[in-house]
From Swiss-Prot:
Keywords: Actin-binding, Cytoplasm, Cytoskeleton, Phosphoprotein. The modification Phosphoserine is found at S8. One of its GO terms (molecular function) is actin binding. Does not display typical F-actin depolymerizing activity. Exhibits a high ability to stabilize and cross-link actin filaments. Functions as an actin bundling protein with the highest efficiency under acidic conditions. May play a role in the modulation of levels of histone H3 lysine 4 trimethylation and H3 lysine 9 and 14 acetylation at the FLC locus. It comes from the Eukaryota. InterPro entries: ADF-H, ADF-H/Gelsolin-like_dom_sf, ADF/Cofilin. This is Actin-depolymerizing factor 9. Its main location: cytoplasm. The lineage of its organism: Eukaryota, Viridiplantae, Streptophyta, Embryophyta, Tracheophyta. Pfam families: Cofilin_ADF (PF00241). Induction: By auxin, gibberellin, abscisic acid (ABA) and kinetin in roots.
Length: 141
């Protein structure tokens, strides 16, 4: 059963939430990348990163000229030596992508965010410098 997202009329496939929950609870994935399928009007899983993959692997997997959503499970150790985990929701909207695509991603974002319960921080980026690893570290701590 697919879930409808907000005003865009896009449907989110069951695999979208399943992959997110596997990342959040089972730690099977380090990240999940989502893609909008314009013709079928669905949000689908584009790629999942194995537990051993890094933030750099996620950044490298994002296309230079197409928009994507991504969730990333950031693990870190606090100054008190406590292990922590924060989930980031990233909207990737590169300047080279089509205007129509940017608008579709913008209008679908809130619906997808509501379904992906447990996200701690949001990040929007139009080029790689706006989503560098240092930005993730600064936001999480």
């Amino acid at each position: 059963m697919a879930l409808k997202t907000a005003t865009s009329g896009m449907w989110m496939t069951d695999d979208c939430k399943k992959s997110f929950m596997e990342m959040k609870w089972k730690k099977v994935h380090r990240y999940v990348v989502y893609k909008l399928e314009e013709k079928s009007r669905k949000v689908t899983v584009d790629k999942v990163g194995a537990a051993g993959e890094s933030y750099d692997d996620l950044a490298a997997s994002l296309p230079e000229d197409d928009c994507r959503y991504a969730v990333f499970d950031f693990d870190y150790v606090t100054v008190d030596n406590c292990r922590m985990s924060k989930i980031f929701f990233i909207t990737w909207s590169p300047e080279a992508s089509r205007i129509r695509e940017k608008m579709m991603y913008a209008t679908s974002k809130s619906g997808l965010r509501r379904v992906l319960d447990g996200v701690h921080y949001e990040l929007q980026a139009t080029d790689p410098t706006e989503m560098g690893f240092d930005k993730i570290q600064d936001r999480a701590k």
